[in-house]
Regions:
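N-terminal targeting signals for Sec/Tat export/insertion, comprising classic cleavable signal peptides
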Residues: 27-48
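Histidine-anchored nucleotide/phosphate-binding helix
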Residues: 63-82
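A cross-taxonomic marker for long C-terminal extensions/tails that follow the last structured domain
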Residues: 20-27, 104-108, 113-173
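Acidic/histidine-rich, surface-exposed loop or edge segments in extracytoplasmic proteins
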Residues: 43-59, 100-105
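Second-shell loop/turn segments in exported
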Residues: 52-63, 89, 108-110, 151
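N-terminal signal peptide c-region/cleavage motif recognized by signal peptidases
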Residues: 13-15
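Acidic helix-start/capping segments at beta-turn-to-alpha-helix junctions
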Residues: 83-101
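Positively charged n-region of N-terminal signal peptides that target proteins for export
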Residues: 1-4
């Protein structure tokens, strides 16, 4: 019996590792390895109300990790056949991550290159993700309103976004 269970475990593990990385919803970002042979899957009949607090400037695959995490979640939900109408995603951006909100022109002026997050920000917005930036962080970093990506909305504070949406039933990711 032990050999049988060990054999099944090895076969299952090989099946998972052989699968390709995919990005079914947010093309090119938030790669996932999807498998139907796992115990817990996103449930297509649930309403997914998710909120992300993005404060770190840490990068993953060339973009801010928090944005990549949102893409990852949308790709997992999409691969599991959860309809877009069942998914609502919001993010609160503040702290060291605030610079991700800059337009390409403003980012170029400040860092000498185009904003590597712009394409992902645009894809997330096209897929209904609401991206809010803390106006306190914007003021602290002396960012002009004209330098903010048009897909980013200013909020009084990151804390107000987090509180309001969690009180509306959003789950913090």
């Amino acid at each position: 019996m032990k050999k049988y269970i060990l054999s099944l475990t090895i076969i299952y593990s090989l099946n998972l590792s052989a699968q390709q990385w995919i990005t079914p919803v947010i093309d090119g970002y938030g790669e996932i390895k999807y498998s139907q042979q796992v115990a817990v899957q996103p449930e297509a009949d649930l309403d997914y109300k998710l909120i992300y607090k993005i404060t770190s400037s840490e990068e993953r695959n060339g973009v801010i990790r928090g944005l990549n995490s949102i893409a990852h979640s949308l790709n997992m939900l999409g691969a599991a056949k959860v309809r877009a109408t069942k998914i609502q995603v919001v993010s609160s951006i503040s702290g060291p991550a605030t610079s991700l909100i800059l337009t390409d022109e403003a980012y170029q002026k400040k860092y000498g290159k185009k904003n590597p997050n712009t394409a992902l920000i645009n894809l997330l917005a096209e897929n209904g993700v609401k991206l809010y930036v803390c106006s306190q962080a914007v003021a602290y970093k002396k960012i002009k309103a004209s330098d903010i990506n048009p897909n980013i909305t200013s909020a009084l504070s990151g804390a107000s976004v987090m509180a309001n949406y969690q009180l509306k039933g959003y789950v913090r990711m």
